[in-house]
């Protein structure tokens, strides 16, 4: 036997409108309200359901007005046990999440419930903010061009990240997006010293648990808030979890005037959840089955991730590329909003080179002399030229063999192979798997090393010496060891 109750009290004790559920189809719930008390779009609604296992409160978000006093809402939790005729109450506002210093070190779901409170522990947040907010006014925006040094050679040299910018990590399944984003959390949170917010959007629960354990072990969790809506959650939760995390980040930026790091893994799942919700609401699909509002939804999220005067949100977003197809509307729509792209390539990971960054496809808007300096730009351009020439020659090598190349091209191929291997690097996030300690290489050392390699100073070093090493000192040590053995 199931009994259901609903109170008539809204937030702050005000009288809330109550309605009645008239239809339930999976996560889609239709409710009828009095004509003069219709809830607004995006308002949160609550319904209390008592099951044999105890009572639970479902949160619904109004998505459509159907006419005839009916609203259609998307549930943020499974609707098991919800039946027609149950009373539902309008809270009078959109979903809100806790904000402030008390959220650091805690894990939340999309509706702001804390998931890792100890027995007897309570959370006293500074405030609650609505997750649907306007982007900062144009007059308040402040473009940033300062480089965010990561200590990862391939990124710092060829696709440098922007402080206060939006960075995309593109790649298909299993090429290392989550490992790289975990690596960036460890590196940047340690060196950056600011506040971090992590949004787990539609990814594996195991990865979420691993991330919490790693952050606790490395000591960065006390400066981080985590918001999870994993792949076993309803589409409504996966669609809103990024907004919930972004709202927490905006509070640190706008009220506490802090520099904030926002990590989103995975932005494709945000798009995917939007597609599911769009289908559930009966909208006509657009290209490749995506929602017709894809560009609008992506823009609403990305336009809020920005720099305002004095402080910024720096965002790293993992972006799954379906079937490695970069023309798919989901990754293609995201490209336009990014300041830097790091493309992870399966053919590079197949060679055992990690991080498996494609040096020719990755890009950054600040890789220009006026932003990174003339020497950095010149070295990066020369490295790309050598790698591009090697790529152009690969068909000839495959058919005729390397012996048929000119002496100049043979030299180029040798240097390209050394550069390709030197772009690999041991990471802190993979230490437990590889047993090899991660390395951080300052940008000046990175530029100096690649300048010497591209000019031929290390042509006599064996190629294997360049593989998975840190800076110049590490390279020279490995080369001496290998030459002594040989």
Swiss-Prot record:
Alphabetized InterPro entries for the sequence: AAA+_ATPase, ATP-synt_VA_C, ATP_synth_F1_bsu, ATPase_a/bsu_AS, ATPase_alpha/beta_chains, ATPase_F1/V1/A1_a/bsu_N, ATPase_F1/V1/A1_a/bsu_N_sf, ATPase_F1/V1/A1_a/bsu_nucl-bd
Family under the similarity heading: Belongs to the ATPase alpha/beta chains family.
Protein name: ATP synthase subunit beta
Gene: atpD
Bilayer topology term: Peripheral membrane protein
GO terms assigned for molecular function: ATP binding; ATP hydrolysis activity; proton-transporting ATP synthase activity, rotational mechanism
Alphabetical UniProt keywords: ATP synthesis, ATP-binding, Cell membrane, CF(1), Hydrogen ion transport, Ion transport, Membrane, Nucleotide-binding, Translocase, Transport
Role: Produces ATP from ADP in the presence of a proton gradient across the membrane. The catalytic sites are hosted primarily by the beta subunits.
GO cellular component terms, semicolon-separated: plasma membrane; proton-transporting ATP synthase complex
Predominant place of localization: membrane
EC number(s) recorded for this UniProt protein: 7.1.2.2
Compartmental location: Cell membrane
Self-association and partners: F-type ATPases have 2 components, CF(1) - the catalytic core - and CF(0) - the membrane proton channel. CF(1) has five subunits: alpha(3), beta(3), gamma(1), delta(1), epsilon(1). CF(0) has three main subunits: a(1), b(2) and c(9-12). The alpha and beta chains form an alternating ring which encloses part of the gamma chain. CF(1) is attached to CF(0) by a central stalk formed by the gamma and epsilon chains, while a peripheral stalk is formed by the delta and b chains.
Catalysed reactions, semicolon-separated: ATP + H2O + 4 H(+)(in) = ADP + phosphate + 5 H(+)(out)
């Amino acid at each position: 036997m199931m009994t259901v109750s609903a109170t008539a009290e809204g937030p702050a004790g005000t009288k809330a409108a109550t309605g009645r559920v008239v239809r339930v189809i999976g996560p889609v719930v239709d409710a009828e309200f009095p004509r003069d008390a219709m809830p607004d779009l995006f308002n949160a609604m609550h319904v209390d359901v008592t099951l044999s296992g105890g009572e639970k409160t479902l949160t619904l978000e109004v998505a459509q007005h159907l006419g005839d006093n009916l609203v259609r809402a998307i549930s943020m939790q499974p609707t098991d046990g919800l039946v027609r005729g149950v009373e539902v109450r309008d809270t009078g506002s959109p979903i809100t999440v806790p904000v402030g210093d008390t959220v650091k070190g805690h894990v939340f779901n999309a509706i702001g419930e804390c998931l890792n409170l100890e027995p007897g522990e309570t959370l006293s947040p500074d405030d609650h903010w609505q997750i649907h907010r306007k982007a900062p006014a144009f007059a308040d925006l402040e473009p940033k061009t300062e480089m965010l040094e990561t200590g990862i050679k391939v990124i710092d040299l060829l696709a440098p990240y922007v402080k206060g910018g939006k960075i995309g990590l593109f790649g298909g399944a299993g090429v290392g997006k989550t490992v790289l984003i975990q690596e960036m959390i460890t590196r940047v949170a340690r060196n950056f010293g600011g506040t971090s917010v992590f949004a787990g959007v539609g990814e594996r629960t195991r990865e979420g648990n691993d991330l919490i354990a790693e952050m606790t072990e490395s000591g960065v969790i006390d400066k981080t808030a985590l918001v999870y809506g994993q792949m076993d959650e309803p589409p409504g939760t996966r669609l809103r979890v990024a907004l919930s995390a972004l709202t927490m980040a905006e509070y640190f930026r706008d009220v506490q005037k802090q520099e904030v790091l926002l990590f989103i893994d995975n932005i494709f799942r945000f798009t995917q959840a939007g597609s599911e919700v769009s289908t559930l609401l009966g909208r006509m699909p657009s290209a490749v089955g995506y929602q017709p509002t894809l560009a609008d939804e992506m823009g609403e999220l990305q336009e809020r991730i920005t720099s305002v005067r004095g402080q910024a949100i720096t965002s790293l977003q993992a972006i799954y590329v379906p079937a490695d197809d970069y023309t798919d509307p989901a990754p293609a729509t995201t490209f336009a909003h990014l300041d830097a792209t790091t493309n992870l390539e399966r053919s590079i990971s197949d060679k055992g080179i990690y991080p498996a960054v494609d040096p020719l496809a990755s890009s950054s808007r600040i890789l220009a002399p006026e932003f990174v300096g003339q020497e950095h730009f010149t070295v990066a351009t020369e490295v790309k030229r050598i790698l591009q020439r090697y790529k152009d020659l690969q068909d000839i090598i495959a058919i005729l063999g390397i012996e048929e190349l000119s002496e100049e091209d043979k030299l180029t191929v040798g240097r390209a192979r050394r550069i390709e291997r030197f772009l690999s690097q041991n990471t802190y996030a993979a230490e437990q798997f590889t047993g090899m300690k991660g390395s951080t290489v300052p940008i000046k050392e990175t530029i100096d090393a690649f300048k010497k390699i591209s000019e031929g100073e290390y042509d006599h070093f064996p190629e294997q010496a360049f593989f998975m090493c840190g800076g110049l000192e590490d390279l020279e040590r490995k080369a001496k060891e290998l030459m002594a053995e040989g």
